[in-house]
Curated annotation (Swiss-Prot):
It comes from Methanococcus aeolicus (strain ATCC BAA-1280 / DSM 17508 / OCM 812 / Nankai-3). It is an enzyme of class 2 (transferase). ATP binds at residues 7-15. Pfam families: Cytidylate_kin2. GO terms for molecular function: ATP binding; CMP kinase activity; dCMP kinase activity. It catalyses: CMP + ATP = CDP + ADP; dCMP + ATP = dCDP + ADP. The keyword Ribosomal protein does not apply. NCBIfam families: cyt_kin_arch (TIGR02173). One of its GO terms (cellular component) is cytoplasm. This is Cytidylate kinase. GO terms for biological process: pyrimidine nucleotide metabolic process.
């Protein structure tokens, strides 16, 4: 089973991916964690590393390569904004692909709480990060991250609590597996 889950920062992808991973006994691989680890290794913050990645496409290519390689082994929940795109570009079809969305201010509040930052700081960082990623994805892969047509399921994660979002996805996986 290969499950991809994507969404902009603050939509709950990591929380949901962990729940899916635990329930179905799948490996959980998060592109964002790989990106953060690379930033830390280079002694940079996330914003600074995002700008660095704009000038150094090898960063994104390495993350993508790792994701595709791991997905080919199966039994995985692959979390990342480009996870579904990268698999499909490499002729690997996910069992199910999910995109989580939520209004900007809801996402900002979640990020602010998670990062222990004030709302304005979190909003500024969120906007800068999203703009940087959108630009990189377009330039590197000609991917419009706003095109959600490749996903099986799109869920507004602000409309339900975590248990509700997970329940919807769990039922979809169970029905897809039959």
């Amino acid at each position: 089973m290969i499950i991809t889950i994507g969404g902009l920062p603050g939509t709950g992808t990591t929380t949901i991916a962990k729940l899916i991973s635990e329930k179905y006994n799948l490996n959980h691989v998060c592109a964002g964690f790989i990106f953060r680890d690379m930033a830390k290794e280079m002694g940079m913050g996330l914003q600074e590393f995002s700008k660095y990645a704009e000038e150094n496409p090898n960063i994104d290519h390495e993350i993508d390569r790792k994701q595709v390689e791991l997905a080919k082994e199966g039994n995985i929940v692959l979390e990342g904004r480009l996870a579904t795109w990268m698999l499909k570009k490499n002729s690997v079809e996910p069992t199910i692909s999910i995109w989580l969305r939520a209004p900007s201010m809801v996402r900002c509040e979640r990020i602010s709480e998670r990062e222990c930052e004030d709302i304005n700081t979190a909003l500024n960082k969120m906007i800068n990060r999203e703009n940087s990623e959108k630009k990189r994805y377009k330039e590197l892969y000609d991917i419009n991250i706003d095109d959600l047509s490749i996903y099986d399921i799109i869920i507004n994660s602000s409309a339900w609590n975590i248990e509700g979002v997970f329940s919807i996805i769990d039922r979809a996986i169970a029905n897809k597996s039959k």
